[in-house]
Swiss-Prot record:
Protein name stated in the entry: Envelope glycoprotein N
Region feature Disordered, mapped onto this chain: 23-48
GO cellular component terms, A-Z: host cell Golgi apparatus; host cell membrane; membrane; viral envelope; virion membrane
Localization of this protein: Virion membrane; Host membrane; Host Golgi apparatus, Host trans-Golgi network
Residues passing through the membrane, by range: 56-76
Signal peptide: 1-23
């Protein structure tokens, strides 16, 4: 049972790395259009309101974590199938 445990550990590390990378992704600094309170057209003052929208990186973290965990499950199943096929071939 050594290889499946290694796959599980590697999978967990992969999921954690993806979650950390997705959380750190995205631009730094001020959001677009808020540089000094002026927009890019004519230099007019831009009034912004908080509409409760999440930033794209923050919204995508659950998606990336879910996709990574699904990938880990698929890899684990493929490893199990390959082990069974190899064991059946040697029997």
């Amino acid at each position: 049972m050594g290889p499946p445990r290694r796959v599980c550990r590697a999978g967990l590390l992969f999921v954690l790395l993806v979650a950390l990378a997705a959380g750190d992704a995205g631009p730094r600094g001020e959001p677009p259009g808020e540089e000094g309170g002026r927009d890019g057209i004519g230099g007019a003052r831009c009034e912004t309101q908080n509409t409760g929208q999440m930033s794209a990186p923050g919204a995508l973290v659950p998606f990336y974590v879910g996709m990574a965990s699904m990938g880990v499950c698929i890899i684990a199943h493929v490893c199990q199938i390959c082990q069974r096929l190899l064991a059946a071939g040697h029997a």
